[in-house]
Amino acid sequence: MAEMGSKGVTAGKIASNVQKKLTRAQEKVLQKLGKADETKDEQFEQCVQNFNKQLTEGTRLQKDLRTYLASVKAMHEASKKLSECLQEVYEPEWPGRDEANKIAENNDLLWMDYHQKLVDQALLTMDTYLGQFPDIKSRIAKRGRKLVDYDSARHHYESLQTAKKKDEAKIAKPVSLLEKAAPQWCQGKLQAHLVAQTNLLRNQAEEELIKAQKVFEEMNVDLQEELPSLWNSRVGFYVNTFQSIAGLEENFHKEMSKLNQNLNDVLVSLEKQHGSNTFTVKAQPSDSAPEKGNKSPSPPPDGSPAATPEIRVNHEPEPASGASPGATIPKSPSQLRKGPPVPPPPKHTPSKEMKQEQILSLFDDAFVPEISVTTPSQFEAPGPFSEQASLLDLDFEPLPPVASPVKAPTPSGQSIPWDLWEPTESQAGVLPSGEPSSAEGSFAVAWPSQTAEPGPAQPAEASEVVGGTQEPGETAASEATSSSLPAVVVETFSATVNGAVEGSTTTGRLDLPPGFMFKVQAQHDYTATDTDELQLKAGDVVLVIPFQNPEEQDEGWLMGVKESDWNQHKELEKCRGVFPENFTERVQ
């Protein structure tokens, strides 16, 4: 029996719910069709819109916060792995290993604490805040259904009120019929029954209307109070949430900054203690390493071998080649020392070919007066001197050679015009005391006490010696050696090879570095590739000095000091260096 009762209650409840759904659906259809009016509350509808907006924003904030926490978790894992990697590569003998391990542990704890506080103070608060929205949302939906029930009950009650007159007319018609067919006493009972039935339906409709109105108003009043309050609470919730996140993040970064600073101090200390292991590799000549001697200057572009310059004693002009040697681009020695960048080729300048007549013209009558003739007081002629005797018949003492090394021909190979020759200063001590110095540019020749002007044959014989075209039959010219007049000519030309004057006075060498050999001028820029090399610019003058250890000298390289550095510092050890010879041109 109990089972039958429970089944009946369940069936009745289902039937009631179905009846309610049908009634609500019918009412909504009538409202949409305009046949039934709908109760509206604009203020409540605005609150519902704000509620939906607030729910959307809160849901999005919760989603983004969960993403942020997931990123913090991932960052924690990445930082943990990085710290583990540091612990693995940090060798036990290195200083500060314990401090580094402790910093790694504190780093891990700091990340865990930061993540947990974010969960407690931000995520859980967000979940609590959003937990009230589903209940309110369901109450709003229920309030909408109760509003439909209220409208349906109201419409039903109003329909009964308007149909009262129609029912009375329907009841009056049967009464008239009954009056005709039934006795008088029976007609009154029938009319009373119809009136009672109509009143019962009206009373039921009124009760349902009052009940629906009461339920609706209760829910409506509650929601009217809660929705505005919930909407206003969003500001404080957002402020507290983001303040908590910002404060936690600030404290986290402060603590993390301290840990990072401590780790940086440990690493700096490690770097300082192991700084001696870092050194700069500098190439030094040794027995095991290949020397610079293996390096040789690059051959010229025309393929001709680079030969050592030789001194031309006969002073013949060098034959002009097809292409001007000035266009040759010098190359630095290769192998161990990297060569400098290829300099731009210089402009071609036409070389002036010296004719033999121009050379011979230096020894005719116009050239003889420049020779100052001195007569030593203790000199006695070996025999009578005739007026017709030539210079070749004289036996005069040869001049000592200049102490400075003879300048080799310039790499450019261009002939220097004779009009650019400059007189040579003789060394101190060459001439006897009391004799005039040759600083004025005249050639000092020791003549006998009885002198005579040279005859016309003198220039011809001298020119034969200068030109180097000695005939086999001329015995007088063949006997002329370096002890006769050609010694003067050789001395003159050796002092002015390629137009460069060799200053060899003692006073001129006071400002030169010890062991000075000659001067060169850079023709192209050279960038030093090692610490022992000179940095050259086109036009720099370099004072060439010998190597301290001749075995260290490499082929194609010279040791020297820039003239500007020497004049400024006067410190040979700091200013000297090596440089490629084929990037320079000898000037003195």
From Swiss-Prot:
Is a key player in the control of plasma membrane curvature, and membrane shaping and remodeling. Required in muscle cells for the formation of T-tubules, tubular invaginations of the plasma membrane that function in depolarization-contraction coupling. Required in muscle cells for the formation of T-tubules, tubular invaginations of the plasma membrane that function in depolarization-contraction coupling. Is a negative regulator of endocytosis. Is also involved in the regulation of intracellular vesicles sorting, modulation of BACE1 trafficking and the control of amyloid-beta production. One of its GO terms (biological process) is lipid tube assembly. The modification Phosphothreonine is found at T308. Residues 29-276 form the BAR domain. Keywords: Acetylation, Cell membrane, Coiled coil, Cytoplasm, Developmental protein, Differentiation, Endocytosis, Endosome, Membrane, Nucleus, Phosphoprotein, SH3 domain. Residues 515-588 form the SH3 domain. Residues 474-483 have a biased composition (Low complexity). This is Myc box-dependent-interacting protein 1. Heterodimer with AMPH. Binds SH3GLB1. Interacts (via SH3 domain) with DNM1. Interacts with SYNJ1. Interacts (via SH3 domain) with DNM2. Interacts with CLTC. Interacts with AP2A2. Interacts with AP2B1. Interacts with MYC (via N-terminal transactivation domain); the interaction requires the integrity of the conserved MYC box regions 1 and 2. Interacts with BIN2. Interacts with SNX4. Interacts (via BAR domain) with BACE1. Binds (via BAR domain) F-actin. Its main location: nucleus. InterPro entries: AH/BAR_dom_sf, Amphiphysin, Amphiphysin-2_SH3, Amphiphysin_2, BAR_dom, SH3-like_dom_sf, SH3_domain. Pfam families: BAR, SH3_9. Residues 15-42, 193-274 form a coiled coil. Residues 2-122 are annotated as: Interaction with BIN2. The lineage of its organism: Eukaryota, Metazoa, Chordata, Craniata, Vertebrata. One of its GO terms (cellular component) is extrinsic component of synaptic vesicle membrane. One of its GO terms (molecular function) is RNA polymerase binding. It is found in: Nucleus; Cytoplasm; Endosome; Cell membrane, Sarcolemma, T-tubule. The modification Phosphoserine is found at S296, S298, S304, S324, S332. Highly expressed in the brain and muscle. Isoform AMPH2-1 is expressed only in the brain where it is concentrated in axon initial segments and nodes of Ranvier. Isoform AMPH2-2 is widely expressed. Residues 279-355, 448-483 are annotated as: Disordered. Phosphorylated by protein kinase C.
